[in-house]
């Protein structure tokens, strides 16, 4: 009789640990051009460099991404023999693409953020990159800026 109760408790605890997807879309009561201007100003303030974008869109990148914006898991590296060591992310990068489309006198804003980090395998004197998982923090900052 205990097993079902323990199993239920385990599932409830596990569900409490799960994070939902980051909110990356919102409708804002402003024209799309104004929304993109607000988000662009926020990206500039955060140290992003804007790259060419299409009308109704904005693209930017940063080579100094903050750890609060994404979770970069440690990586297990080796030398090909028996030696293994865990390494942490070093330099972090972020790329953001923002679109703002007209939506009945408002703007439908969508933010697509991608993160990656450099890792160093000191055993082989080699570097590599891995993707990192968003925390939703950057997206929330940009959506707040979109609202003014």
Question: Where are the language model's segments positioned?
Answer:
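Bacterial N-terminal signal peptides that target proteins for export
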Residues: 1-7
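C-terminal motif of bacterial Sec signal peptides marking the signal peptidase cleavage site
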Residues: 13-16
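Ser/Thr-rich, low-complexity intrinsically disordered terminal regions
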Residues: 18-148
